């Protein structure tokens, strides 16, 4: 099985890039390529990536005009030659040892979930323990804690992505990872789970960005887009009626929580205005009234504040 690692890059410091690249370069037996997609980084970053790829034949460097991480990942998907794709953020690393021994036994899957380790300073926390890989189980896990939303620590079958026209939504600036997985689920994939850690996610290197100040209205739309998609997926599931309603309530509580946090952030960076208020009002009014009645007290309080 040939694997394509896709690493989107935007102004990541060279010493952090080297940490990422070296974790992949240490793989010995697995046939792979590593596709570096430079999303318009400043000059010295591009030079470092180009030099590294020139000295490591399995690394391929491509530079493109800045279009966001979804655009970079999509470019990587189009260029990938491997049977499976594995996404790596440029400030994270893979757990090298497992890749040489992992690949056998999963060749028929369209998506293989693995586990990751969250690194937060000196603390490490394992994110894993999937209870199952049916549509209903994966969707429920996505709703319950959001720990499987990201594209990393997963092996995506390239042919399945192509046959179903699956790409990341380049119009979104937040929530695009979850929407990609939701769209994938809707295509009836064969999914498997490997109880093995393959990825180190470095929380301390994830600097806060300025998406809210730059794209406030898109951030609002993204919240609604993800919410509608999840409700649509819940409707398509084989849940009992009671469980289906419970999942919808939980997702509605999550939407309210996200909208409330977004409103506070927009106010703090001075981008809250009448247009934003109008968009919030429209989203809130479109939430099913029965669901609003059934959310918890904290959600009702937040909803009341946003309506005032």
Model-identified regions with their sequence ranges:
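N-proximal low-complexity "stem/linker" segments adjacent to membrane-targeting elements
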Residues: 1-23
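Glycine-rich, basic loop-to-helix element that forms the pyrophosphate-binding segment
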Residues: 64-80
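Donor-binding/catalytic cores of nucleotide-activated saccharide
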Residues: 69, 90-194, 199-218
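Short hydrophobic beta-strand elements that form part
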Residues: 4-8, 35-36, 63
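Short, acidic, metal-binding catalytic loop of nucleotide-sugar glycosyltransferases
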Residues: 22-31
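A conserved acidic beta->alpha catalytic loop
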Residues: 38-48, 89
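Short aromatic/hydrophobic "clamp" motif used to bind/position activated sugar donors
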Residues: 85
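Membrane-interface aromatic/basic loop that binds lipid-linked glycans or pyrophosphate carriers
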Residues: 61, 262-308
